[in-house]
């Protein structure tokens, strides 16, 4: 395949490795290494300035594959054929264009951040069945003086029906409750340790959330009480 490499973790599904490059979403047979299918993701949307940089692992749910990336590129839902040899696009959404980390599928909705520029974005919710944008909202948290501080874009993960959002520029980590037309920020705090960017995706295992920044790794108890 031609095109730029990507910063994406592959997904293993039904005997295939599903992956994204700068140009394609594609599936590779685990046993033979043969490429079973490709989808021209780079040409799926029209951008004024095309940047074939993919940093978001695809979401796979049964025969459905959700692919997104930043830079005004948007999100597409693909349906994998029963024989595993082809895909077809079911819908495209121009609002949800997550740049870093990931999006999540929760109760039939896709949650993630949008890309306005490399320092800012909003948080969005998209209907997974129709591709309709349900809401988009700025992310704001209370400052020390009680005034709301606008934050940017970043990473979204989920556990126990709640969303954890990690701002990739300022290091703010927030717990959010998804609602019908917005996200309700329950609590938040800032990651102050480590160095450089906040690009590592937090992970949750057995009620413990692991957060890395640079050469420092921290663990937090996030079990539902």
Predicted regions and their residues:
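Noncatalytic, solvent-exposed loop/strand surfaces
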Residues: 1-225
């Amino acid at each position: 395949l031609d095109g730029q490499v990507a910063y994406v973790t592959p997904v293993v599904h039904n005997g295939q490795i599903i992956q994204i490059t700068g140009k394609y979403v594609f599936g590779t047979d685990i046993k033979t290494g043969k490429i079973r299918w490709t989808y021209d993701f780079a040409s799926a949307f029209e951008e004024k300035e095309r940047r074939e940089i993919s940093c978001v692992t695809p979401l796979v749910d049964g025969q459905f594959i959700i692919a997104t990336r930043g830079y005004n590129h948007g999100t597409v839902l693909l349906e994998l054929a029963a024989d595993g040899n082809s895909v077809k696009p079911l819908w495209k959404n121009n609002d949800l264009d997550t740049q870093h980390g990931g999006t999540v599928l929760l109760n039939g909705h896709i949650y993630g951040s949008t890309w306005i520029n490399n320092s800012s974005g909003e948080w969005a919710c998209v209907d997974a069945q129709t591709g309709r944008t349900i809401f988009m909202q700025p992310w704001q948290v209370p400052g020390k003086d009680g005034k709301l501080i606008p934050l940017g874009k970043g990473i979204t993960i989920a556990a126990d029906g709640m969303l954890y959002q990690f701002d990739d520029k300022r290091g703010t980590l927030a717990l959010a409750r998804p609602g019908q037309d917005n996200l309700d920020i329950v609590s938040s705090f800032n990651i102050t340790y480590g160095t450089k960017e906040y690009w590592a995706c937090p992970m949750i295992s057995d009620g413990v959330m692991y957060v890395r920044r640079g050469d420092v790794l921290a663990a937090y108890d996030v079990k539902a009480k």
